[in-house]
Amino acid sequence: MRRGECVLLCGRSGMGKTTVTKLINGLIPQFEPGVERTGEVEVCGFDPARCAMHELARHVGSVFQNPKSQFFNLTSNDELAFGLEAAGVDADAIEERIRATVGALHVEHLLDRGVTKMSGGEKQSLVFASVDVMDPDVYVLDEPTANLDARAIRVLHDQIAAILARGKTVIVAEHRLYFVADLIDRAVLIEGGRVAREFSPEDLRALSEEERARLGLRAVDPAVAMAVTCPAAPACATGALERGLSLRGFASLRKKRRVFAPVSFDVPRGAVVGVTGANGVGKSTLVRAMAGLERATEGELRFDGAPLDARARRRRCSLVMQDVNHQLFSDSVRGECELSAAGVDAARVDEVLAALDLEHLEACHPMALSGGQKQRLAVACALLAGWEVLLLDEPTSGLDFGHMVEVSRLVKGLAERDICIVVVTHDCEFLSRSCDFAYELEAG
């Protein structure tokens, strides 16, 4: 890569895109025990394997797949200042650089906030801001849009364009190709840990839908990627549904602050219902409250006409969290599935593992999987558990086209077994393929 170039790393989940980014930022081999590097890597004149990390960090800034893995502070302001303080920058200069960065990124609403209370998308935006404030020469972005809403993606696109205009170098490992298609100089397809093909921006846009699907690539045209074609949600019934979920005036307060406003909607048995909305409006808190993991302070939730308190909701509902690292406990992929599938025969476990392209990984430790593979494993566990209500929070985060389609097929197949499914997602392709209708959650 030349200075000032923007290169996209694309391809199916688990093919080695994140590994390439770790070679560039020095995490391999410096922070990956047992991993050996052969060959040569040079970044800004340094070999990342032999350069002190604090020195390399002046030149290379990284945004990881899981934003929580790179926070060092409890508040957003401290997080933004952390790298500059470690580099010995003057306090007045730190304040000025933070002010300029949050203004350019339009993330002023993230200042003076507790990091742990932010939504997944807000955390992603904060991580990018904490990297940008350091003004590195090279930006390494691993799935930077995984948890972002449409507005935040547009802001990120414009900021990458501004970074490139300053002569910076950008490497993006990403499945959402549409948001960088007009910024890149070339795209590199990674398959099986090797460079399989390279595309110019024109060649990438010229790929047919069949060719993209064969390569595991998502839509390149924003008009296709952002189109939502599922029907509008029907009006709420006067009373609770006789068969399905009914929320009436359902709301949550946290420290006297309303996390999401009272909501009322229905999820019939056999339906897949989408929930969309901007980052931070309370979508994840809503499904956590529906699952009995967060306190609901107003309204009620009924299932098949009967009210459910928090304990009853925990018995009826299965939640696949946005950060699936919180719900992987076993020491193998198969063990994880069997933990969730008490009473399910081995053939059914084999079937689900094969459907989600995990059968070749069944002996692997869940924490050794890529982000997309972990996501598919969490979905597999939920499918095997046999709950009556399935809640999915960003289930396609980090998934390539083929695996997104497979999750969609399995979710729709599960709905046919007469269960209720709610999907929180920013993924318009998945929403259009999977949901019978959708609700949009707004602040207030």
Regions found by a protein language model. Name each.
Residues E40-E55, E300-R313:
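ABC ATPase NBD Q-loop/coupling interface
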Residues Y139-D142, L390-D393:
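Catalytic Walker B motif of ABC-type/P-loop ATPase nucleotide-binding domains
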Residues C10-R12, T276-A278:
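The feature captures the beta-strand-to-loop junction immediately N-terminal to the Walker
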Residues G114-M118, E122, H365-L369, Q373:
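Conserved ABC ATPase signature
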Residues D92-L110, A346-L361:
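Conserved ABC ATPase "signature" region
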Residues E174-H175, T425-H426:
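H-loop/switch region of ABC-family ATPase nucleotide-binding domains
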Residues N25, A291:
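Helix-to-loop junction immediately C-terminal to a conserved catalytic motif
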